[in-house]
Amino acid sequence: SSKWEACCDRCACTKSIPPQCHCADIRLNSCHSACESCACTRSIPAKCRCFDITDFCYKPCSG
């Protein structure tokens, strides 16, 4: 699978309905392709994390 495809290994959801899920993965230089709210450190390489809240988890990246 493409490394740019949206995926997440460490996803956490609340038990509410609908659930509120977020991905805790740290990626180098960019967030996954579906991320709208991405924050990166200024280090080289940059460590980026997606802060989107969704009602689902993306499929795992490592498979």
From Swiss-Prot:
- Enumerate the UniProt keywords alphabetically: Disulfide bond, Protease inhibitor, Serine protease inhibitor
- Which InterPro entries does the record match to this protein? Bowman-Birk_prot_inh, Prot_inh_BBI
Which Gene3D superfamilies does the record match to this protein? Cysteine Protease (Bromelain) Inhibitor, subunit H
Q: Quick check: keyword Transferase in the entry?
A: no
The Gene Ontology terms for molecular function here are: serine-type endopeptidase inhibitor activity
KW Disulfide bond (keyword) present: yes
Similarity field: Belongs to the Bowman-Birk serine protease inhibitor family.
Top-rank lineage group of the source organism: Eukaryota
Q: Hey, where's the site called Reactive bond for chymotrypsin on this chain? A: T41, R42
Q: Pfam families from the xrefs?
A: Bowman-Birk_leg (PF00228)
Record site feature (Reactive bond for trypsin), residues:
T14, K15
Name this polypeptide is given = Bowman-birk type proteinase inhibitor
GO terms under cellular component: extracellular region
Organism of origin is Amburana acreana (Cerejeira)
What the protein does comes down to:
Inhibits trypsin, chymotrypsin, plasmin and factor XIIa. Does not inhibit factor Xa, thrombin and plasma kallikrein.
- Residue pairs linked by disulfide bridges in the UniProt entry: C7-C61, C8-C23, C11-C57, C13-C21, C31-C38, C35-C50, C40-C48
